[in-house]
């Protein structure tokens, strides 16, 4: 892509797409796990078919959305605050915001941006931002943009509220939507009732919940982030590189545990954290199969819980890689039914959300089926996130149908990114 080229996207007026038939009204309960991450997750999906042009893309997307919203009717409502002071959904049925748009080029002009996913300023143009929205309550749970390109392909850009869907639930919603577009029944109908995860009465906090601890920045990291431009990079970890990491770790561990320990250590080194800086690692563990009983198939809410390590930067950077990998392993092993229900009850008592000061938050989308959504134009040629929700986040991403590789996306201040890149050469 030539550096001088600028993607220009011309949007039409947004419309509201409501469920195709009457749906239940009233307040829809969101669990305490749904309260944790009040952010909009932005993703894009590029479709191109040799046998079907993009002329009807907007109408197909709109019609199938209207039909699938009958099953996922809370997504057509609006977020509100419940009488208990928590985020809930007012099931108004008013609909999802959908925007039709045209790009000034074929997709080849932005090939680098969409394949390396490290140019959020370009990708942001493919997802609609609700103008004037001051907070999460003023943004509909789902926002859709369909952008047609001159090459005959189109991009489906989505903004989805994390209070409504975690990654697994979002992929199941998208899959249901794509099945509807192809005239198929839903292979996994949604299970909408989130009261399964109500807090206990009375609440029982049985574990320390340091994931919510607010740490002090004594290393000047906040100033570094404000003084320097954030640079985004993606790093591909293929099977051979991942195997080398496991050998370096000198301990029995999963790919996730090894890679997480390695990246945590590398980021601490790149940011030049003081040895006595208290730091935190947060990552989401899927609790669907760990709850007792397990959550039902198709559970359409947040089934993830945050687990954590809290230590000092020196403990991570001055010890061998095996030490940080073992810390990650211990955090994974903490997550069971008792820990997750204790976290639910902790929020009920404190209303605390995880603090991100001196924290790295790792989110793995590596096992999410980004590439399998077929709305009638075949599977996406390429898909992925639009930027990162917070500067403290590292994303693990799938590499299309290659299940043995992981693409790592992060942003760091320019000087720190140079150091980080050097550490990635293993």
UniProtKB/Swiss-Prot annotation:
Residues annotated as the enzyme's active site: 162, 374
GO MF terms held by the record: caffeoyl-CoA: alcohol caffeoyl transferase activity
Enzyme Commission code(s) on record: 2.3.1.-
The protein, known as: Fatty alcohol:caffeoyl-CoA acyltransferase
Family stated for the protein in its record: Belongs to the plant acyltransferase family.
Top-level lineage group: Eukaryota
Protein function: Involved in the synthesis of alkyl hydroxycinnamates in root waxes. Functions as a fatty alcohol:hydroxy cinnamoyl-CoA acyltransferase with apparent preference for caffeoyl-CoA.
Keywords in alphabetical order: Acyltransferase, Cell wall biogenesis/degradation, Transferase
Species of provenance: Arabidopsis thaliana
Tissue: Expressed in the outermost circumference of mature roots, the endodermis of young roots and in the seed coat of developing seeds. Expressed in outer integument layer 1 of the seed coat.
Enzyme class: transferase
Single biological process term from Gene Ontology: cell wall organization
Pfam families per record: Transferase
GO CC annotations on file: plastid
Name of encoding gene: FACT
């Amino acid at each position: 892509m030539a550096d001088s080229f600028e993607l220009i996207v011309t949007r039409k007026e947004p419309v509201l797409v409501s469920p195709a038939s009457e749906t239940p009204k009233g307040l829809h309960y969101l669990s305490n796990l749904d309260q944790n991450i009040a952010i909009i997750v932005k993703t894009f999906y590029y479709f191109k078919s040799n046998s079907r042009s993009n002329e009807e893309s907007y109408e197909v997307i709109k019609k199938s959305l209207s039909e699938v919203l009958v099953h996922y009717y809370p997504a057509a409502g609006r977020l509100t605050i419940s009488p208990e002071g928590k985020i809930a959904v007012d099931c108004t049925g008013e609909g999802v915001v959908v925007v039709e748009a045209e790009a000034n080029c074929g997709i080849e002009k932005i090939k680098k941006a969409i394949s390396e996913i490290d140019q959020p300023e370009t990708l942001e143009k493919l997802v609609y931002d609700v103008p004037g929205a001051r907070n999460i309550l003023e943004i509909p749970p789902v926002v859709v943009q369909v952008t047609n390109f001159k090459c005959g392909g189109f991009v489906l850009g989505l903004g989805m509220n994390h209070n409504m869907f975690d990654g697994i639930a979002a992929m199941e919603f998208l899959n249901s939507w794509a099945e509807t577009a192809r005239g198929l029944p839903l292979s996994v109908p949604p299970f909408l009732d989130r009261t399964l995860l109500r807090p206990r009465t009375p609440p029982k906090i049985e574990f320390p919940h340091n994931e919510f601890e607010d740490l002090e920045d004594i290393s000047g990291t906040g100033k570094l982030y404000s003084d320097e431009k954030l640079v985004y990079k993606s790093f591909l970890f293929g099977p051979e590189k991942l195997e080398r990491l496991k050998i370096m770790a000198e301990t029995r561990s999963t790919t996730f545990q090894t890679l997480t320990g390695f990246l945590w250590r590398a980021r601490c080194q790149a940011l030049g954290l003081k040895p006595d800086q208290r730091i935190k690692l947060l990552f989401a563990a899927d609790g669907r199969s760990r709850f007792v009983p397990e959550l039902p198939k198709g559970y359409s809410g947040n089934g993830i819980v945050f687990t954590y390590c809290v230590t000092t930067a020196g403990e991570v950077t001055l010890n061998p890689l095996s030490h940080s990998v073992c810390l990650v392993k211990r955090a994974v092993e903490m997550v069971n039914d008792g820990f997750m229900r204790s976290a639910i009850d902790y929020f009920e008592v404190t209303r605390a959300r995880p603090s991100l000061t001196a924290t790295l938050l790792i989110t793995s989308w590596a096992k999410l089926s980004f590439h399998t959504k077929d709305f009638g134009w075949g599977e996406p040629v390429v898909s992925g996130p639009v930027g990162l929700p917070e500067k403290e986040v590292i994303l693990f991403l799938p590499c299309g149908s290659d299940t043995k590789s992981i693409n790592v996306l992060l942003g760091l201040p320019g000087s720190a990114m140079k150091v980080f890149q050097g550490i990635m050469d293993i």
